[in-house]
Swiss-Prot record:
Required co-factors: pyridoxal 5'-phosphate
HAMAP family (UniProt xref): Trp_synth_beta (MF_00133)
Protein name: Tryptophan synthase beta chain
Protein role: The beta subunit is responsible for the synthesis of L-tryptophan from indole and L-serine.
Top-rank lineage group of the source organism: Bacteria
Record gene name: trpB
Length: 402
């Protein structure tokens, strides 16, 4: 590990646990990334794409209706307004620029909810790169609008039927492809997890979320928030929000994992709260696993949070007490999803609804407390409307006009 340019670990978590054939590939990627970060032209090109193609900066919106009856001020960082519909577009643009700089001619990616796949497909279309997307067959079925979007933009989408046919299996398939085709192919990993240097690369391309949020909240309120809250699957939207606040110790960092059908049922995706440390997906990190080390299936109503592990920097932030990680059930996320749509006219992604649900819990616990909260609304909910409609119909929920 001493041969790496950057520290591959966050405390005890992280590392490069990959087949020997991929070690030089990862080190070349790290070298190219370090050089690109020192190149003003690369940075200018990246920031120009974020501004004039993706639509940054994104808005910071105050929720005036959801907080009625309390003394809380609640703001949403509107990554749902980014081109592509989620925060994923930020780091995808950065990684594809990096791949082109390295002379790669093909992009592969995994996707769960389909948002990373859509972001990869749109950026590949615009930057002229062939694109192969791996997606669990279960997710292909529940995220059909995003599958159509990817194919419309020229991506080849492969439904992975192995294992549980979910995100972790798509990740494994993408890694296999990369091991066979690394000479001309870049694996555009979609979250702040996996082997070094991916967690660092993804964080650096996502940190603009927190940088903008800090500037915007200071301009609006004249002070830093009491807490920033973000959903955590692999952890990219959360680390993008948290990064600029880590040194601001007055700001609580709250990550929200999926409790699924309830932690006690075992059907959840909360490795930070209820996992044990293991080796998975090229890294050492908290993991949902059996006592003998077999990977357990994660579960969430949200495809993008349905992942049995988490990025190593989140594990480190938890270990040193800088960030706290809570969990929200499917039902709580569904309630927040409906509340935001009904009272603010914003339809969030189910992933983002988990973060919002925890913020609403904080408000309900202490309505008289004056507090300033920011939720990272990491994506829009267009992709989830059919899932939500089906579930609410089964529950007998009807939609009545005001």
């Amino acid at each position: 590990m001493s041969e790496t340019l950057l520290n591959p670990y966050f405390g005890e978590f992280g590392g490069m646990y990959v087949p020997e054939i991929l070690m030089p590939v990862l080190k070349n990627l790290e070298k190219a990334f370090v050089e690109a970060q020192q190149d003003p032209t690369f940075k200018e090109t990246f920031l120009d794409l974020l501004k004039n193609y993706a639509g940054r900066p994104t808005a910071l919106t105050r929720c005036r209706n959801l907080t009625q009856g309390s003394k809380t001020k609640l703001y949403l960082k509107r990554e749902d307004l980014l081109h592509g519909g989620a925060h994923k577009t930020n780091q995808v643009l950065g990684q594809i620029l990096l791949a082109k700089r390295m002379g790669k001619t093909r992009i592969i990616a995994e996707t769960g909810a389909g948002q990373h796949g859509v972001a990869t497909a749109l950026a590949c279309a615009m930057l002229g790169m062939p694109c192969q997307i791996y997606m669990g067959a279960k997710d292909v079925e529940r995220q059909s609008p995003n599958v159509f979007r990817m194919r419309l933009m020229g991506a080849n989408v492969t439904a992975v039927t192995k294992g549980s046919a979910s995100l972790k299996d798509a990740c494994c398939e993408a890694m296999r492809d990369w091991a066979e085709n690394y000479e001309h192919t870049h694996y555009l990993l979609g979250t702040a997890a996996g082997p070094h240097p991916f967690p660092t690369i993804v964080r650096e391309f996502q940190k603009i979320i927190g940088e903008e949020t800090k500037q915007q909240i200071l301009a609006r309120e004249g002070r830093l928030p009491d807490a920033v809250i973000a959903a955590v699957g692999g952890g990219s939207n959360a680390i993008g929000m948290f990064n600029d606040f880590i040194e601001e110790t007055s700001v609580r960092l709250i990550g929200v994992e999926p409790a699924g059908k309830g932690i006690a049922t075992g059907q959840h995706g909360a490795p930070l709260g209820h996992g044990t440390t293991g080796i998975y997906f090229g890294m050492k990190a908290p993991l949902m696993q059996t006592p003998d080390g077999q990977i357990e299936e994660s579960y969430s109503i949200s495809a993008g949070l349905d992942f049995p592990s988490v990025g190593p920097q989140h594990a480190h932030l938890q270990a040193i007490g800088r960030a706290q990680y809570e969990s929200i059930t499917d039902d709580e996320a569904l309630s927040a999803f409906q509340a935001l749509a009904r009272h603010e006219g914003i339809i969030p992604a189910l992933e983002s609804a988990h973060a919002l649900a925890y913020a609403l819990k904080l408000i309900q616990r202490q309505p008289e407390k004056e507090q300033l909260l920011v939720v990272n609304l990491s994506g829009r909910g267009d992709k989830d409307i059919f899932t939500v409609d089906r579930i609410l119909s089964q529950k007998g929920v009807s939609y009545a006009p005001f």
